[in-house]
């Protein structure tokens, strides 16, 4: 399994790090030029990924990370992926933008079910309600 994500803090960074720790490949799709590491807290991971996977961007080198770039890059994340797994998402989340793009592209969408009322589970629970496959154990995805 290869991980394709946006190198963001939290679940994205953990997924990239986990793939690398397991000897896998991982790819970061940036919302800026490939010469920018954003967020800067992922600098070490960014450099390792350059050697054990890749850093990709539709933005030219020298393009800074701007807020409106991140929703745009999410369609590339889904386009490069065979399937999307949303682990946690608030009701307004970039992960939901990626899931919507995946559905438009005919990709399978998985979501980790969460507790009702948990703000970080609202997006996943909504995706499941709308037809995403509940991923409560790894075998469902694999």
Predicted regions and their residues:
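Glycine-biased, small-residue-rich flexible motifs in mid-sequence functional cores and linkers
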Residues: 1-142
